[in-house]
Amino acid sequence: MTRVLSILLLVLVTNSIQSQSLQIIKSPNALPFNDKKVKIFLGGSIDMGKADNWQSNLEAQLKNKNIILFNPRRDDWNKDWKPISADSNFRKQVEWELAALELSDIIIMYFAPNSQSPISLLEFGMYAKSKKLMVVCPEGFWRKGNVDIVCERYNIEMYNSLELLVEALKNRVKQEPIF
């Protein structure tokens, strides 16, 4: 009987530890609508794969946090998909991003220098009044002035680097209520 209890306790502890770690959900995987963890959308420069993979760097820095990251950067992106609503792969991507943005408690927007990021600008505008945004827009982003002014107007948290955002995010996640 003691052995059975020991095994049961080990299983419970293991499950508890696993549930206390970072979970990364990439498009097009299913979104966890009923999970109580803080959910963070990694929005920002991808530019059809031309931008640095800043998302993986952020994932590594948050590996010990009990949160969920929604990463729209696809490992299987196909440049031949047409950006039209009739293309089922493209539609699935856009619908995944919209659902993930809505589900997120925090939305990170990173506008990389020398990138254009038109979809990120669209999503930034959609959520400017939401109080969910944390923004990094360093010198060199082609519309930095627009981003700066919108952040000022709507009192959006803005950082000069991803490193500063990560530190602020870690502090915010400590204080974020679990719904």
What are these regions (language model features)?
Residues 1-20:
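Bacterial Sec-dependent N-terminal signal peptides
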Residues 18-179:
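Conserved catalytic or regulatory cores that recognize and/or transform ribose-phosphate-containing ligands
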